[in-house]
Amino acid sequence: GDICHKHNLKFIVDAAQTAGSFPINMEQMHIDVLAFTGHKSLLGPQGIGGFLVSDEVAHEMIPLVTGGTGSVSDSEFQPEFMPDKFESGTQNIPGIYGLHAALCYLEETGIENIHAHEMELCKAFIEKIDALQNEKIRLVGVRDMNKRGPVVSFDFIGEDNAEVSFKLDSEYGISTRCGMHCAPNAHKTLETYPQGTVRFAFGFKNTMEDVDYAVQAIQKILQK
């Protein structure tokens, strides 16, 4: 944030993978815009998301979508006040209520507690995979737990990553996300393009037994 502001740039954070599992303070981190989805670590339903903006950005930004808001209906122009300025059309009320219930649970549980548990599982998972000493397994990302989140991506050398992901699901009941994760240029930089990676994401309800089961499943698949 500091670097962006020194160059008169806005600092925009995509918190799709971190909101709900990582403590975020927009003011301390100098974040101008924070975009999030509700269905991942925020534990809400699909089809709901949002963005938090600073007062400055809220004033300067021009809405991409305009239309009826249910307020200032006698005007042909978009309202300038928040949140109506960016909320045209009928809102996803069931999604909003679902996300609200999820946020209440997260607040009661504590983001710090969730983050600590998920990172403990992440650390154990990486260590146990490393212990296999299998040259086919390439961790994509850093091992420093202070510089990563509880999402782990692997590139299985010499294997079809999509096939590995399919077998994890069909044979072991383990859901992963395979592919380029809406970031093809990132995968080009990481040299995982065009196959992408197999991504594991740990949640608060996962256990150490789940970690052991996933490691064993990977080991068995690569032995076949």
In which residue ranges do the predicted regions lie?
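Pyridoxal 5′-phosphate
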Residues: 1-224
